[in-house]
Amino acid sequence: MTNATDTNKTLGESMFAQCGYAQDAIDKRVSQVWHEIFEGPNKFYWENDEGLAYVMDTGNNDVRTEGMSYAMMIALQYDRKDVFDKLWGWVMRHMYMKDGHHAHYFAWSVAPDGTPNSNGPAPDGEEYFAMDLFLASRRWGDGEDIYEYSAWGREILRYCVHKGERYDGEPMWNPDNKLIKFIPETEWSDPSYHLPHFYEVFAEEADEEDRPFWHEAAAASRRYLQAACDERTGMNAEYADYDGKPHVDESNHWHFYSDAYRTAANIGLDAAWNGPQEVLCDRVAALQRFFLTHDRTSVYAIDGTAVDEVVLHPVGFLAATAQGALAAVHSAQPDAEHNAREWVRMLWNTPMRTGTRRYYDNFLYAFAMLALSGKYRYE
């Protein structure tokens, strides 16, 4: 059925097991995640008459590169090549832009019938697609045409790096500071887009000439995350300038809010794959400490000041912060290990979300369950 319940060739230790949960119970929870997203009455995965498939953002009633790339990663982790290929086929048919200013990027939002809602890309989709494809090639080998996974992964990254130089358009990474942009046209970032653990794989799989770039990008992102995450609270803004400070404009994305929750999870997975970074481990430990003693339903500025707004994705926030335990447990702060285990226990005791906002929350939940069970693999 699925390979995510196997224990061979995993990240290593399961934090769930370290917290005392039995392996059978862990495996059942991991299997439940697949059922909830892809099969059960609360699923948001759909197959169509073309033999392809998509996942829908149930809160916005559209199909996003974010969600499609997340679903592909989950299909890969569960060894479901059939689902992976149906999703990737839908992406290439309905999201891939063959011409125009953003040629070779993907339209970030599309209606379920394939009608584009936007002609612009969102870089978190492209970086996840590239990673999905490289890992698919490692696991299943390359096929033909769009299923020649590694070739497509290399193509995506080639345009991400070299647009504005050899190709029309703008790159998704600033060529000077090696930091990912919020969108190609902007010169600021989104801290939750920074995936140094992915860039280490890109440095092995991308075009030979670009591999040094990806090594540098991994190091640059780790430095950036240190700057973006507040030393006392561990929080980062949704949008941040290249110095890590919140990006303030009319869009009102300078608080610790929806996108921002993913940062702790990303730091945790990087620690699991590549070893802990002391400062980043301390940042996640600070985040976990703050939210064990403050109202978790409130939105905050990154300095810890409460904002008159309510968290939109409470389950996703909890799951991503719990995944950060993979880093926080390595912090030298005296309460870090205890707090990390408390977050893992809170996640274990929290069900997946139902209702219209379940899409984002349950994706973050799925990634956390895989990572904390030692089953989020990169080989």
Curated annotation (Swiss-Prot):
Alphabetic keyword roster: Carbohydrate metabolism, Glycosidase, Hydrolase, Polysaccharide degradation, Xylan degradation
Catalysed reaction equations from the record: Hydrolysis of (1->4)-beta-D-xylose residues from the reducing end of oligosaccharides
EC number(s) from the headed UniProt entry: 3.2.1.156
GO MF: oligosaccharide reducing-end xylanase activity
Active site (record annotation): 66 (proton donor), 259 (proton acceptor)
Superkingdom of this protein's organism: Bacteria
UniProt keyword Electron transport, yes or no: no
Coiled coil (UniProt feature): none
Biological process according to GO: xylan catabolic process
Temperature dependence: Optimum temperature is 40 degrees Celsius. Stable up to 40 degrees Celsius.
UniProt similarity note: Belongs to the glycosyl hydrolase 8 (cellulase D) family.
Designated name of the protein: Reducing end xylose-releasing exo-oligoxylanase
Organism of origin: Bifidobacterium adolescentis (strain ATCC 15703 / DSM 20083 / NCTC 11814 / E194a)
